[in-house]
Amino acid sequence: MSVSSSNLINKAVEHLSRFPGVGKKSALRMALFLLKRTEGDTIELSEALLNMRTQIQYCDQCFNLSDGPLCNVCNSPSKDTTIVCIVKDFQDVIAIENTGQYNGLFHVLGGLISPVDGIGPSDVKIPELLSRVQEKDIKEAVIALSSTLEGDTTEYYIAKKLRDLGVRVSTLSKGIAVGGELEYADEITLARSIKNRVIIDN
C-alpha cells in the first residue's frame, strides 16, 4: 500500500520499514526527516551505512564485530585478560559492556547447540574457545547465555569442557527471565546478574 503520492518516497519507506520495530508510519517519518536534511547529511548517512556493511569484519580472537583484525575490547589495555565472558552474539557483548560491571574479554559463539536443528559444538565457535583457553592464561570463564533449552544445553557442554581444562566456570545469577535474551534485559538486572555470578561446580 502506498503511503505517499511520490514513488521515490514510497520506495524509501518500503526499505526503512524492514528495520525491526519500524512500521510504515515510522518509516514515512524517517523518510520525510531525511528530505528536510541537507544533501550532504544524506550522503554522509548513506556512506556510513555502506562502509559499515562492506568493512565490518569479525575479530580474529573473540569473533565480535570489528573494524580491524582485533576488536576494541580485545585491543583495550585496561581489560582483564584472565577472564572471558562467553556469549551467543555480538548484541550480548554490547549489552554486557553497557552495564559497566564487567572488565574482561569476550568470546562470541555465533550460535547455540541445538540437536533438533542439527547444530553441534563444532558448528559454533566452541572449538575456537577451547583452543583459546589452552593458549591464553584464562583463569575464569563466565557463561552468559539465554535461559532457553539451547542455552542451557550449550552452557552444560562448555562448562564440562572448561572444568576439565582447570578453568573456573561461572554463570549469571538468576534474574534474566527464562526464555529471555540478554540483549533485552534491562541494564540494572543484567549488571546485578554479572556482579552476583554463580560458580558452576558440577
Which sequence ranges carry the predicted segments?
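Core recognition of P-loop NTPase motor domains used across DNA-transaction enzymes
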Residues: K11, D41, S46-L49, D60, ...
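Catalytic cores of large soluble enzymes that bind and process phosphate-bearing ligands
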Residues: S4, R37, D41, D117-P121, ...
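Conserved, well-folded catalytic cores of nucleic-acid-processing
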Residues: H15, F19, R37, M52-Q55, ...
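Long C-terminal interaction/binding lobes of large macromolecular proteins
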Residues: L130-N202
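Extended interfacial segments that mediate partner engagement and assembly in macromolecular machines
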Residues: A27, S76-A144
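Solvent-exposed alpha-helical segments within well-ordered globular domains of core cellular machineries
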Residues: N10-E14, L28-L32, I43, E47, ...
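Cys/His-rich Zn2+-binding cysteine-cluster or related metal-binding knuckle/ribbon modules and their
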Residues: V3-I9, R18, M30-V93
